[in-house]
Amino acid sequence: MHRLIITAMLAFAAIAASAQTVIEGTVADAQGKHVEAYVSVAPKGTGNILVFADTDAKGHYRLEFTTEADSVTVSASGLAIGSHTKQVANRSQRLDFCVKEQAMQLKEVTVRAQKIRQNGDTLSYLVGAYQQQGDRVIGDVLKHMPGIEVADNGGIKYNGKTIKKFYVEEMDLLQGRYGLATNNINASDVATVQVLEHHQPVKMLQDKELSDDVAINLKLKNSAKGTVAINTMLGGGAQQAGGWHIGKRPLTDSQAAIGQSPLWTAEVVGMYFAKRRQNMTLYKGNNTGDDVSKELTQHYSSVNSVSLYPFCPTGALMPNGSGLPQKRTFDNHSQILTMNHLEKPNKDTELGLNIAYYNDRIRREGSSVGDQFVSNDSRLLASEAMTSETKLNNLNIQGRYNRNAPNGFVANVLKVDTHWNSDRVDGLLASERTGANPANYGNNRVRQHFDRPQLSVSNTFNTIRNIGKNTFDLHFSAGYAHRPNTLTVGVDSLLQGTSTAYTQDVNSHHIAASFNTSYAIRVGQRFRFSYGVSATANLHGIVTDLDGFTPPAEHAQLSNDLWYNTYCVALAQTYKYETPNFYIGLGVPLELYTQTLDDKIRNDQHGYTHLLFFPSLSANWSISRDLWLNAGANYSKTVGDPGGIYSGYIMSNYRAFQRSYVEQLRPRNAMVSVRFKLL
């Protein structure tokens, strides 16, 4: 039985072997050189490929197949030789091809690149892979990229972290106003969007100080480099006007809508991006409710300039917002004009100039109704309707010099900001009491005018040097701000036929300076100790005068003339342990804080000195690209501000007249905070 089975199997094998065809040979050119080719075989008259093979290094191929066809078609093809075919009998044989060089014409070639590529700490998004129909500027495409968030104000985050730098071709042209780039650079001009994790912008610190910051860099297509691009847009329309005008429109007619005709929008954007020079100049304007000033928002500053905030607690009461989308309720006449220019004399030096001007006229209308229960049978009803017009004129100029080399860092930034803004508000206030003893308090017409100009100038210098393996950092910033503001209020009682006028003048000065040095010592590869001395000074000059208000007899002062100054000298100590994925830092600063007050009206001069200790602890653990833990704790103490040292009355608005004098010898405000973040 076993012998019969073996005999049968051998018979089937012989039949199969006899049915298999083997065709082999070589593919060569006229000179006998071997050619790379793709060789296939199919039954004659059909396109059904039975088997295929590539030639080896010697140009040899071998095809083994089985078919019942009498003849077969053998084809040899390649990009350099085109396609060559031979029809032969279906039998084992040798078949050689002698071919001539002949380019193959391809109908279509599709190359699919990766949407996201990673190279170390750099993540590159291919713009073409994320661009959708209707995406005009690069900001539209950013919203589709995973991990990147774009807020309503134009701010950008990556995996929950706010970006600290925004570059176009590795150059920071816009100095934090990157809304100008995201809203105006054409998406079709950008090749890739690079996310730079653990970004250290100071070259000399890249191998010394780890950073957890994130930056974005736009890589442009070659066609967009070194060429001047100008984009223009003009639009117009009409809407029904509401007959609105301050002082002329009857305020009792609260049904008429604010509006004007005709509508218009216009923009002209010029851009130039080259290896050593960049420029972006644009004008935008409209009265269609589009807030173009958002593009001028500065999301970060290249240097830590002093904060200038001249004291002014006065302001006009404005109509309340409707809660509807701003686009539907913003009655504006907005214009922005900005010029941003950057020169790069060499690879380490930059000279930049940024100028931004914003002009607007914003009109608002609002009304409010109040209903208070005075007793079980008595209610106090009040209603107020307001119309307002705000005029804004803001000019910002910033010039900077920056040298960022592997052996040293120097930066100097000069800023000038000036605002000449004003508010005009016209309101109608009505109130009455219901119940057993009803009373009509009549209608009061309230006119407010708040003139609020401001000027500020500051300069900031920063240099960093390496001393062996250690680092020395020096930073100095100083500035001056002046704010002469006037609030005028007129109240007309329509029932009693009387009028009252109030005028509040506030003339405020602020002089600020900040100086600090630090010396960082690196111990091994993980530990970094930093020691430094810092000094700050803030001088506030406040002169106010109130007219038209009758104060209580016990506090009859209606003016202020004083200087409130603070000085601080601190010894800073920071201890850090850091790896690429883990960081923990302890700060133990010790501050000597002095306050002085010179009140010329009260003839009061005194000062206080405090020794303050503000420890802090922070830690960060990057578990993966998308998951990290962040925790921190700090202790701080509040020691006062200019808002608590004036003894004369100031009109905050026409409803509030206040004075504030608090002894600050023993400050009692304290704060402890703990932060925890998990993403």
Language-model-detected regions and their locations in the chain:
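Short, acidic Ser/Thr/Gly-rich low-complexity loop/linker segments typical of extracellular
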Residues: T46-H60
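Short, ordered, surface-exposed loop/turn motifs in non-cytosolic proteins
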Residues: A30-K44
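Extracellular/periplasm-exposed beta-strand and loop segments of Gram-negative cell-envelope proteins
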Residues: P319-S334, R363-F373, R379-Q398, W420-T460, ...
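A short, solvent-exposed loop/turn motif at the edges and junctions
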Residues: V41-N48, T73-K86
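Hydrophobic h-region of N-terminal signal peptides that target proteins for export
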Residues: L10-S18
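Membrane-proximal, glycine/serine-rich, low-complexity loop/turn segments characteristic
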Residues: Q20, T26, K58-R62, S71, ...
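Conserved catalytic residues of ABC-type ATPase nucleotide-binding domains
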Residues: K100-K107
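Exposed aromatic-hydrophobic patches
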Residues: H60-F65, D96-C98
